[in-house]
């Protein structure tokens, strides 16, 4: 019997993922539970703005919860494009009005799934970020009493912003991750970026 291309690629990747998954150091830390046997549903697909709205998922919570333990949803923060799948994030802490619904609908969906014993996992984006009104003006956001404001030093010096005429030059370190031309690549060696990402997660 011939293996499908999917099996040839995905099975080794899944095995590698399992080998590389970190374990919790102590009880109560954020980590995948030991011996977890649940099943997760990807609650969206590309350009699924209508089918994956928070209200649509919530309306199907009872049925979905009878089959799945976790629902994976796209990034819930406001993005720079409209509509957007959430992979061009602007806000991390303060604006949860996305192409999938508003913050009240998001909270209601999470609460409903929780009543059925089903968790929600959000796809978060921390490799790159967009500004609120231009390429680099990241909004100042306050979370748990602390205000986070990233500047040009948070953007990798080899980001495409550096090649734009009339734009200020980013002053962060060279990119340590994947270059994404649609947003500003964040300098993850910068302590301010690290602190904001930890708070966001």
Positions of predicted regions on the chain:
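Bacterial N-terminal signal peptides that target proteins for export
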Residues: 1-10
């Amino acid at each position: 019997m011939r293996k499908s291309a999917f099996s040839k690629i995905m099975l080794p990747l899944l095995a590698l993922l399992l080998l590389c998954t970190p374990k919790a150091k102590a009880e109560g830390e954020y980590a995948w539970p030991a011996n977890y046997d649940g099943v997760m549903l990807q609650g969206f697909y590309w350009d699924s703005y209508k089918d994956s709205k928070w209200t649509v998922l919530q309306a199907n919570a009872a049925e979905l919860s009878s089959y799945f333990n976790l629902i994976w949803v796209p990034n819930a923060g406001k993005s720079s494009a409209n509509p957007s799948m959430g992979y061009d994030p602007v806000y991390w802490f303060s604006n949860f009005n996305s192409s999938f619904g508003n913050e009240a609908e998001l909270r209601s969906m999470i609460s409903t799934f929780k009543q059925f014993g089903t968790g929600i996992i959000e796809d978060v984006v921390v490799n790159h970020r967009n500004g609120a009104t231009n390429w680099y003006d990241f909004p100042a956001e306050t979370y748990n009493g602390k205000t986070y404001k990233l500047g040009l030093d948070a953007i990798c010096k080899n980001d495409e912003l550096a090649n734009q005429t009339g734009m200020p030059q980013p002053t962060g370190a060279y990119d340590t991750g994947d270059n994404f031309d649609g947003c500003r690549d964040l300098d993850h060696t910068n302590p301010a970026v690290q602190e904001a990402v930890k708070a966001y997660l």
